[in-house]
């Protein structure tokens, strides 16, 4: 009876002997690769590849969502430059109304400018551009640009008491801060 060297417990096993349980002995020739080790390495490589694939898919999905969000913001705020350019025109209309109200013979001019201003403001509002109130509100550096401070007894400290130029928002984004005068406590320099 011939015997072969078998990998396993290191001993010799007769060729016709029966194996017990789930122990499996595989003959390995010197210089021949161990297929179980090779299979284990390939399974690990497969796991890593699947993990990389899942990460890349998640990254692609996140990029797609970010691009969609940026696109919708771009559409919503596409007119921002136009709105900024129109604001000085709006300011001039308001100034014309302010100065012409003192003239008695300019009634029809005042009414025409007032109607133009109202139509202009309505058009801006349709696109989400609206002025915000500042006078009487607390000074907020996110929405107001203080050009002066003034001692006033009628208002609490750091309250907007006068507006030189209105502030505007485009949807929920600040388009232009309001230029304001802010109250200060008596005796502050």
From Swiss-Prot:
Keywords: Chaperone, Cytoplasm, Stress response. Transmembrane segments: none annotated. Homodimer. The lineage of its organism: Bacteria, Pseudomonadati, Thermodesulfobacteriota, Syntrophobacteria, Syntrophobacterales. Participates actively in the response to hyperosmotic and heat shock by preventing the aggregation of stress-denatured proteins, in association with DnaK and GrpE. It is the nucleotide exchange factor for DnaK and may function as a thermosensor. Unfolded proteins bind initially to DnaJ; upon interaction with the DnaJ-bound protein, DnaK hydrolyzes its bound ATP, resulting in the formation of a stable complex. GrpE releases ADP from DnaK; ATP binding to DnaK triggers the release of the substrate protein, thus completing the reaction cycle. This is Protein GrpE. PANTHER family: GRPE PROTEIN (PTHR21237), GRPE PROTEIN HOMOLOG, MITOCHONDRIAL (PTHR21237:SF23). Pfam families: GrpE. Belongs to the GrpE family.
């Amino acid at each position: 009876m011939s015997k072969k060297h078998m990998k396993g417990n290191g001993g010799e096993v007769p060729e016709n002997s029966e194996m017990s349980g789930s122990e499996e002995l595989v003959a390995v020739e010197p210089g021949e690769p161990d297929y179980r080790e090779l299979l284990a390495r390939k399974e690990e490589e497969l796991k890593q590849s699947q993990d990389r694939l899942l990460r890349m898919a998640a990254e692609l999905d996140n990029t797609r969502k970010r691009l969609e969000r940026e696109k919708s913001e771009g559409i919503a705020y596409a007119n921002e430059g136009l709105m900024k350019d129109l604001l000085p025109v709006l300011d001039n209309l308001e100034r014309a109304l302010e100065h012409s109200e003192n003239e008695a013979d300019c009634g029809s001019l005042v009414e025409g400018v007032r109607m133009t201003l109202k139509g202009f403001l309505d058009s801006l509002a349709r696109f989400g551009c609206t002025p915000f109130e500042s006078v009487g509100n607390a000074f907020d550096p996110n929405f107001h640009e203080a050009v002066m401070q003034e001692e006033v007894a009628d208002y609490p400290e750091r309250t907007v008491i006068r507006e030189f130029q209105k502030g505007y928002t485009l949807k929920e984004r600040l388009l232009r801060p309001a230029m304001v005068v802010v109250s200060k406590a008596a005796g502050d320099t």
